Amino acid sequence: MRDHNPAKNYPLNQWCMGTMHEARGWTNTILIQDSLLYKYVNSLPVYKCPADRATTRSPWGGGGIPKVRSLAMSCFMNPLPGESRGRGKTYRKQSDFVLGPAMTWVTIDENPSSINDGWFVHESQTGFVDYPASYHNNAGGLSFADGHSEIKKWKSPAVQTFGKRVMTNPTLDRLDATWLYDRTTDFTQPWR
């Protein structure tokens, strides 16, 4: 029997358990329904961009099945203990948003070739650890701490076509990485 108290099921502060790299996470809506956000936003379609047409090959053979989630949360939002990524301000409550809620993104549509857990790691002005999605004519969605959302047009070929072999453009990669970096956290170490 499952414990229906999400706080007990998430000892590591992960907003949504499971992984999108294996079959049991692809279609398991219980992972979303038991997530820490579901009691506030209890509609499954909200957790997947409608433009995400990616499927993952079924372990039973044949075609693919759609994944249930394309959404990931900034790794600086209530991070795992000891997993603050080593630099930057972590956010545990609204008053922690030193950049201001309108300049701090919370969730992002993550590229289907990059999405694994519930976190989106971004801590560099020069490149990406996890890659944003580009479902909307090379653009992807983000939500911010003040409640607004944005569709960001990505310039980098690496972001636009992640998961395919493409040549990167360091200048364009840096433009996209810096744009997201400036809206991620206050990096307290002199990295800029």
Range-by-range predicted roles:
Residues 1-192:
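Short, well-structured segments within or immediately adjacent to enzyme catalytic domains
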